[in-house]
Amino acid sequence: MAGYGHSTAGGFGSGSGSGPPGPQYMLPQYDEGDDPDADATPAGQGVRLLTNLDNSSYISVSEITSQSSHRDNIRPSRLRQAYEPSIDARTYEPSLDTRTYEPSISDRRHMYEPSIDERSSYMDPPRIPPPDGGSYVSSYMGTESMVSGHGRPWSPESATGYRVPPQGRYEPSEIDGHARPGTPGSSYGNARRPLPSAPAPLHYNSPSRAASHYPRYHGGYADDVTVSMGPDDDRTDIFGPETDLSETRHLNDAYGFRSSQITLSEDPHGTHARSRYDDEDDVSTTYSSNTGTSASGVDKFEHYGPIPEEGKHERRGVRPPQMSRKEVQLINGELVLECKIPTILYSFLPRRDEVEFTHMRYTAVTCDPDDFVARGYKLRQNIGRTARETELFICVTMYNEDEFGFTRTMHAVMKNISHFCSRNKSRTWGADGWQKIVVCVVSDGREIIHPRTLDALAAMGVYQHGIAKNFVNQKAVQAHVYEYTTQVSLDSDLKFKGAEKGIVPCQMIFCLKEKNQKKLNSHRWFFNAFGKALNPNVCILLDVGTRPGGTSLYHLWKAFDTDSNVAGACGEIKAMKGRFGGNLLNPLVASQNFEYKMSNILDKPLESVFGYITVLPGALSAYRYHALQNDETGHGPLSQYFKGETLHGQHADVFTANMYLAEDRILCWELVAKRGERWVLKYVKGCTGETDVPDTVPEFVSQRRRWLNGAFFAAVYSLVHFRQIWKTDHTFMRKALLHVEFLYHLLQLLFTYFSLANFYLAFYFIAGGLADPHVDPFNSDGHVARIIFNILRYVCVLLICTQFILSLGNRPQGAKRMYLASMIIYAVIMVYTTFATIFIVVRQIQPSQKSDDKPDLELGNNVFTNLIVSVASTLGLYFVMSFLYLDPWHMFTSAIQYFVLLPSYICTLQIYAFCNTHDVTWGTKGDNVMRTDLGGAIGKGSTVELEMPSDQLDIDSGYDECLRNLRDRVMVPAVPVSEDQLQQDYYKSVRTYMVVSWMVANATLAMAVSEAYGDSEIGDNFYLRFILWAVAALALFRALGSTTFAAINLVSALVEGRVRLRLNMKGFRWIKEKWGDADVKGKFEGLGDRARGLARR
């Protein structure tokens, strides 16, 4: 039975005088029996014709009148053909319970407004031959029965001045309603490229039939969603060659493309929706029980009944994708599919000349990542016309971040790739530089990934619903790998950006792991599976949520290009301050902003000078892939890096397990200490990246627990194994500098271990100094100050004890108020201590009112030297170095918040971290069950049978749903927090011993020093002098290292500019001889601007 699907209001029987205009976008839909080019009408069966979308009715061919009758608005009362079919040959109309609901006219958002002089859409209808040689029979009932009978849907009496918009005039819109990039209505510049030709018939299942009737689309949408991989497929444009708008309109008129697509919706009762034309057997029967009319009465007709009032009503044009079983040829025994991209995405792509732009490649990986290459898996960069060398391999790790964090990172990466392609004078990059860059997104767990993030990936063409399978021939799938070269990007506002905004193609690999196996396993997929297949030069690691600067990735890559000894590099991590710095109003965000800034000004430059950076942050770092490789025996940086993934139970001690909580620190150490090599790590100031920092107390405490424990144990590991440095190929000077750095780290480690006692002692001596009657600020002979000090001292001790209880028995998420209250009390103690320090300093400077003694402002063993000079020098170095790096604003916007929360950094975070050293689990219990929710690929030999989307319309339906979800900001229900997993007794017992020893050590130090110097003045307190001057000395050491780093960078820039200048000054001696020595200097300075320009390149 032939049928074109649903028509629009401008379909058969539409008019301009009554009824609404039709929708704007239509796709042609065909069944297997359609034959638009047939000249004769076979007899024997009735014909199902176009459907009126507005009221879901059927109109037979007999209602189509001649052109002259329509122009005169004359409606014939009755039309009949010579042949009336039998009951069995009449068309089938579905019953009420199987029909789909279509929204009313007022619900339509897109209306096509035709001009008054345009012809009706049914003036020149396509010829539709009835099957089996039958002839047409009119089902027109006449005006009387229309009025008196059941309420038949609206049908206009005239079609003057209205017609359906042709397919070629459709301009796809963004998810926010604006014109998409590249369309004539787009506001982006003047980018007007021709729209794609009308898609081929989507419902043809026979390639020969499609080719015979539509030679233009031969080799296109002729068969399944899955196509075989071969050289011929690369040269075939599955959507037809590009054409201009006039040719598109000609084809639409020639092949009757004015009819719209079939609209399928879910059943109001929640049952499975199906097409009215899905079953060919149904169209050869007559069903009229709903109307109660005789099957032989042609004057009767059935109606569709009232609109359902309850149940889910789908939007018009949206249907759930239909799945069908298909037989697929395996490639090397593995499931590899080439899937067509959605039609709408294809419609605004600037390039469609390669299969990487028109097809998404899916691979079901059933092996461990270490065996990816050995099992014969290949990526697109290894096969066919897309075989390329990879210079830069970018890894973006993801857990359950939403679509805003993902698009913020991904859009920034694509803008960086555009910068690579803009460097036309580079020997490595250029217009086709994107072919040397591959972006790999690794998501940790299929059931954990955020649904809207999947929608964002689908909108870019990288992901498609309904393709993945749980198992292939009874082998469990470990990861689902999607490959596509996308040409569009979504910014953080979920708006499409394309070539008109400078976006270049981006080769993407999306690895969706079946199980949640943590970030370390994601990096194993990146390095051992995909990295081994691509063999890149430089690998860049990013976290979802981090937004690198516009040229950050280039500066990061340039560090490896200019120095062959660089094995790893990192950039500057900035806290995301929000619009106009609004996030800095949160003290937590402001304190972290100050911490990040001072670390990037003092710590990272110092360590970069020595050549060993203790940690390259996973949020923005890069490694030379060759330097990461293991030796012939299998030992090396990567083997040690991934060792932490297999640590469970008593097979690993707590020390080793906690050390691998900061696995990136282990990787840094293994690179520098690699036997027989001279690798160094470098900090790149020009590389910046913004990341969202925790803005709530529970998130902040939980994050720092892993950081502090990992950093502490990794530092101990590097100090214990410092002798490995002598087995490397570093120069003697480098080895000496590294030992100096080890000594610096040892002192830092000791201060960290005793930080709790040092904080208490500093508070005890400075705040207790106000209790002296000679210094009392309240003029009460020290009584008021003594009372305040005793209260705060007891509160501080009790709060520290309470902190231990909280850390041992409560999660931060379950005790939010208690953790917040403790941080507030610590802030009050810090404010009072700061007040005491300032008052004592001022009192020391001013002369005493009770005596004629002059203030003691000389350097020596006094309060001025031990308190004022030491504290002022520390803060002064912070200001000086910040101004030296031309980045001082954090000193004015975030310094106060940091120093107020400093006791919480020392007490709350440190206590919670040490009390949770037992929490070293990497895996997820209960996640070793093979799931079957996706189905599987079952078969024998080289072929398997699996369920896939039936045709292109089903792919488009899933894509359209993803765009609607992103546009409407569809909320995802929050996943309830699962119960805490039981920790092993072994870890808890070791945790207890460690916490007790740490607490006893700090308590002993605090009590001993407070008793020894309890009655001494501040100027005579040796321990206080030691603490303050040690802090000042460490700050000075960091400042010297930072200054050295800045000087080295300056010299390097000058040397690089001078070398470039020499390369561009051919014939310098001839110039000297011609102008003389006096003029050479002036000419040399005149070329300075040119040299600086070359250096910037």
UniProtKB/Swiss-Prot annotation:
It comes from the Eukaryota. It is a multi-pass membrane protein. The lineage of its organism: Eukaryota, Fungi, Dikarya, Ascomycota, Pezizomycotina. The keyword Cell wall biogenesis/degradation applies. Residues 8-19 have a biased composition (Gly residues). GO terms for biological process: cell wall organization; chitin biosynthetic process; mitotic actomyosin contractile ring contraction. It comes from Neurospora crassa (strain ATCC 24698 / 74-OR23-1A / CBS 708.71 / DSM 1257 / FGSC 987). This is Chitin synthase 2. It is an enzyme of class 2 (transferase). The gene is chs-2. Residues 299-313 have a biased composition (Basic and acidic residues).
